[in-house]
């Protein structure tokens, strides 16, 4: 038995989406038409559409970028096809989605959960594979549930297909239950958060599945652990990257969305910590909009505070979050995140009313101008919450928490007059090539370097050499000056100290 919508409610919801958000409807149908032809934009393809196969060649990596294979096997385009069916009633979209999902189940087989000695083999699910545990989790929470709910009542969803899908869902759950805890025993990575969301969503969607109750209980326990391990007392996500922080706000929020739908409770300490995470998202936003792009962060194109606001609106049904985001971002930015979640939001008309009101009455933040995130060794500083204000961010935390960090101890990002003045390079690619090496190196950051050397060895996209101690030594705020002092020993015997000082609310001295 699957917990799904029926066809009438799917079409009713789709009709309201078409009425309230016609431009988003058109975008979804455009993407669906491209997917019908096997044409997608994926990592490594640039901004251009790329033919992935018809059906897709799931296991190939034609552009030599591992993220291409990962993203293709997350099946976002099948979710889009299912949404296009819900918007139009056109069964060709449903048929295409089910044909491709069926093809994947038939031809992309999971590695064994066990090694030759009969022990669980987590490394089988931690490499370039459609069955990497993260992709298992993302299919579980982000794409398969909506594909199933939107298409389960169509003629395409045959008993034969349902049986093979059911078996694959069981395997997904077993991997997430047995393997993921071995990959992330400390629960201290965003992957583990998504993997447990996948386990939660699938166990809720298939309540009569053997071990469903066990899987659900495990997911709730581990999501609590994720919040405890990944969110610092100051509200920041431990990886120290604003993009991943905003992503985690979205993922932590989805637990509340699923809990409301399936009548589950979430501990109060979890929801209160999530609200603190949104405040951190606001601090991590430049005065002129966009993330302070520390580490593997994007600036403005995705995973900004707009995503965190959309997520918290879905979690708490409070317009405050959307109103705050619209102070920094144009409505189009929020709409990109809203479009991806329209089928998770029950009251579309109410959302439309809130967005219309928020556009005309955004909320300017009423928060401190200085935020020293001591657990992350990060500092956010601005002269006001005006968009023309001086705003800067600096950080110094070595050894790094994980490899989304760059080789940039004591670096900084600075904006003023509504413009970026000194930028952190942000993320460019995950592909292990010269671009990745440059974008992570000290030489492409606003850092002090010694003897033309990196602060520590860059071994590859996901490998560094050892690092030495580095931290924010002090932050002092007076009537005329705020000074931030960072310190690290990565150039021993030299010791590196940097002072960033905001003077008279008018200029910055380095």
Segment roles from a protein language model:
Residues 396-409, 427-432, 490-494:
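Glycine-rich phosphate/pyrophosphate-binding beta-alpha loops
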Residues 39-59, 72:
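Short alpha-helical hairpin
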Residues 55, 64-291, 297-298:
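Aromatic-lined, polymer-binding surfaces characteristic
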Residues 408-473:
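Active-site rim segments in enzyme catalytic domains, especially the processed small/beta chain
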Residues 477, 482-510:
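Acidic, contiguous internal or C-terminal segments within carbohydrate-active enzymes
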Residues 1-44:
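Extreme N-terminal leader/anchor segments
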Residues 383-385, 398, 448, 452, ...:
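Short, flexible loop/turn elements at secondary-structure junctions
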Residues 239, 243-422, 471-472, 476-478, ...:
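Carbohydrate-active enzyme catalytic cores, enriched for enzymes
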């Amino acid at each position: 038995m699957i917990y799904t919508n029926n066809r009438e409610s799917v079409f009713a919801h789709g009709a309201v989406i078409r009425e309230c958000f016609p431009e988003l409807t058109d975008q979804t149908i455009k993407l669906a038409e491209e997917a019908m032809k096997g044409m997608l934009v994926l990592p490594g393809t640039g901004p251009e559409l790329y033919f992935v196969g018809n059906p897709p060649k799931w296991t190939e990596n034609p552009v030599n970028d591992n993220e291409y294979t990962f993203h293709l096997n997350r099946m976002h385009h099948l979710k889009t096809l299912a949404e296009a069916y819900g918007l139009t009633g056109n069964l060709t979209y449903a048929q295409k989605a089910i044909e491709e999902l069926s093809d994947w189940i038939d031809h992309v087989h999971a590695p064994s959960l066990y090694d030759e000695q009969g022990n669980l083999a987590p490394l089988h699910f931690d490499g370039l594979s459609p069955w990497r545990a993260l992709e298992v989790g993302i299919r579980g929470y982000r794409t398969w549930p909506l594909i199933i709910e939107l298409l389960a009542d169509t003629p395409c969803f045959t008993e034969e297909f349902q049986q093979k899908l059911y078996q694959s869902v069981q395997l997904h759950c077993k991997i997430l239950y047995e393997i993921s805890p071995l990959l992330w025993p400390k629960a201290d990575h965003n992957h583990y958060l998504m993997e447990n969301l996948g386990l939660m969503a699938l166990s809720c969607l298939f309540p009569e599945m053997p071990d469903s109750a066990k899987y659900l209980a495990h997911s709730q326990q581990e999501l609590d652990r994720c919040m405890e391990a990944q969110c610092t007392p100051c509200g920041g996500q431990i990886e120290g990257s604003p993009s991943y922080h905003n992503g985690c706000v979205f993922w932590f929020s989805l637990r509340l969305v699923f809990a409301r739908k399936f009548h589950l409770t979430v501990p109060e300490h979890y929801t209160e910590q999530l609200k603190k995470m949104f405040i951190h998202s606001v601090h991590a936003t430049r005065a002129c909009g966009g993330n302070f792009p520390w580490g593997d962060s994007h600036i403005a194109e995705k995973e900004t505070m707009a995503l965190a606001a959309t997520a918290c609106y879905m979690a708490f049904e409070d317009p405050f979050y959307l109103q705050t985001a619209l102070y920094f971002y144009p409505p189009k930015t929020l709409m990109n995140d809203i479009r991806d979640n329209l089928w998770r939001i029950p009251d579309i008309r109410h959302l439309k009313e809130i967005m219309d009101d928020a556009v005309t009455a955004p909320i300017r933040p009423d928060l401190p101008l200085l935020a020293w995130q001591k657990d992350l060794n990060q500092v956010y500083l601005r002269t006001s919450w005006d968009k023309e204000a001086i705003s800067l961010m600096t950080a110094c935390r070595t050894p790094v928490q994980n490899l989304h960090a760059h080789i940039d101890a004591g670096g900084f990002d600075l904006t003023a007059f509504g413009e970026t003045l000194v930028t952190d390079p942000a993320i460019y690619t995950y592909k292990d090539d010269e671009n990745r090496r440059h974008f992570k190196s000290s030489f492409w950051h606003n850092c002090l370097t010694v003897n033309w050397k990196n602060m520590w060895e860059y071994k590859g996209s996901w490998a560094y050499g050892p690092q030495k101690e580095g931290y924010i030594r002090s932050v002092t705020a007076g009537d005329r000056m705020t000074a931030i002092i960072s310190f690290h020993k990565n150039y021993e015997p030299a010791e590196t100290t940097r002072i960033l000082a905001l003077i008279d609310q008018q200029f910055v001295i380095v």
